[in-house]
């Protein structure tokens, strides 16, 4: 059963998104650089993620689908991949109304997979805790803050 808050958010045409903080066994974090032709934040580094579609049964289903579409990495619930929610953020318009929300999930991999980028992205890189700082000003807004939140909790 949906909560009142969920019903209210859905009735306002709120867009729902998921993002994955993908971590390999070396404790490196995967970021993708958006292709230059992308209107919103083209050329910026960000997480794997996207919209939750009507066909997705849950945010985790959307996350698994987006990871496969954007990186070629296939995850299933049968495998030993840890997927846990880190944070959920509401995005507001100028009137303070919620227009979208993003759920951020940590995805811990058992191996360092081959990444096959979609055409939405031009590059990818696995970053350790120190090297990620060099991209701080080249990231999509909030990405670096979410990364800091991850490291504070892990």
Task: Report the location of each language-model feature.
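Short, charged/polar surface micro-motifs in flexible loops or helix N-caps
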Residues: 23-29, 37, 108-113
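Unchanged
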Residues: 52-82, 86-142
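Conserved N-terminal beta-strand and adjoining loop/helix that marks the start
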Residues: 7-30, 102-103
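Short connector loops at helix/strand junctions that flank enzyme active sites
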Residues: 15, 40-42, 47, 98-102
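Charged phosphate-binding loop/patch that engages nucleotide di/tri-phosphates or the phosphate backbone
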Residues: 141-154
């Amino acid at each position: 059963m949906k909560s009142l808050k969920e019903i209210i958010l859905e009735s306002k045409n709120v867009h729902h998104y998921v993002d994955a903080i993908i971590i390999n066994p070396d404790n490196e974090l995967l970021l993708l650089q958006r292709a230059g032709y992308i209107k919103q934040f083209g050329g910026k580094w960000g997480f794997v993620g996207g919209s939750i579609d009507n066909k997705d049964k849950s945010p985790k289903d959307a996350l698994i689908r987006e990871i496969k579409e954007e990186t070629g990495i296939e995850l299933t619930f049968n495998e030993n991949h840890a997927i846990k929610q880190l944070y959920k953020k509401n995005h507001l318009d100028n009137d303070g109304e919620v227009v979208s929300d993003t759920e951020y999930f940590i995805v811990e991999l058992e191996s360092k997979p081959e990444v096959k980028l979609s055409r939405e992205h031009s590059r990818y890189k696995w970053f350790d805790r120190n090297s990620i700082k060099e991209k701080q000003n080249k990231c999509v807004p909030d990405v670096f803050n979410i990364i800091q939140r991850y490291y504070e909790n892990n």
